Amino acid sequence: MGIMVYAGTRGSRDEFKGGEVAKAGPSQPAPTLAPPPKLDNWPRWGVTHTQYSADNAPRPVAEQAKGILGRVPLLQNQHIMGWGAGNPEPSPGQYNFTELNRRMSFIASSRGMPVITLCCAPDWMKGGQAGRTDWSKNHTVAPKREHFDDFAKLAARIARQYPTVKHFMVWNEFKGFWDPTTNRWDAEGYTELYNKVYDALKRVDGDIQVGGPYVPIETTAAPGPSELSGPWGTVDQRALDAIEYWIEHKKGADFIVVDGATMTTDKGNVPDDFAAQAKFGAITSWLRKKANDMPVWWAEWYVEPQNSGWSEEKRTAVQATTMMEFARSGVTSALYWNPQQKGGVKECHGCVWAADGQEMPMAGLLSGFTRWFPVGVALEQVQSSDARVKVLAQAQQLVMVNTADRDVTATVDGRQVTLKPYEIKWSGRGQG
């Protein structure tokens, strides 16, 4: 996925050939990675590295990004193929972890809690040619059933390559598992793949935590047949059906993974940009109920319609209130899809750091929520006299967000405050 672009998740099963030559890497030992920091609480918040990140930035930028990410240890997620990583197994049994080694080394050096997403798959597992990579279709094609065992074997090889990684998500957004003949998700095919990967990972290390199904959950503003709806829209029942099939037929799981956007497919954010976020809480509650309170992970979330024209202040305010919704609904992990761009691009909307390494507003938001609202911290009810000022609090700290495009004065937690348009303000409470 890419920032603000939430479409085209239903890949095809087409045959494909060609693409660039994918060479096996030189034989080299696995990197020696520092273990993740020991923390009292699971951080809950984190980032997914995408095509461009700090590991392939100029050294000064990389060092600044390392400091931004590491000041409060975050979850840091990386895919095994695509999104900054080359083909990990260009031909059967021939591996190339060059980019993946570099990315995982950066995560370790920036005190990240490492997470790996097991997607995508080498071409030869999907009907393509061994030794070549067709990147144009990489993200849209699933492994063929006869290669499910090969993909599970690759997953196990990667788990052995990075023994400090204890959390794995299986596949991404059901890519390639849309069945156009039945007009629904092929949950049966995905779950068969998932179960093979689950078994393979657990054989490597029983402490490895495995999650799926990583289904994209879309909504429409128009009503339709669905067991889950609200003022924010109607959930596509086919996504819920796929999730329930996986819950019933999985071999096992340590957490359940989904992703989604506040935007409906037919009308953008409804009823408005801030109220639309209630979708995330409603889906999280549904998941916890259906999966017997299994930890819920949001692998991606999106809140901004294309061509929104939002200022960075509004963008960050909407993200802040979204994170409030995640915390209130009991989400265990929420991974921000970091939209870093190639060096030299001056404007990087929603990025964690700028092209020159300077931190962007999203960085402080992630650090603040990770420090004050990790898993296990008890939330406290705090009143705001003006509904436009949203607040999330624990015993020692609260965060306020002005959702209006004008100054708002309100009494929050017994104190009068004036917030500028879309301002986010942290305030100590001196308790606990």
Model-predicted regions and their roles:
Residues V47-H49, Q78, V170, G212, ...:
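Conserved beta-strand positions
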Residues D186-V318:
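Noncatalytic carbohydrate-binding groove/subsite architecture in carbohydrate-active enzymes
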Residues P29-T32, A57-K66, N96-R103, K153-A155, ...:
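Alpha-helical scaffolding within the catalytic cores
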Residues G25, A30, A320-A404, V408, ...:
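Aromatic- and carboxylate-lined catalytic core of secreted/periplasmic carbohydrate-active enzymes
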Residues V417-G432:
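C-terminal beta-strand-rich structural cap/linker in extracellular carbohydrate-active enzymes
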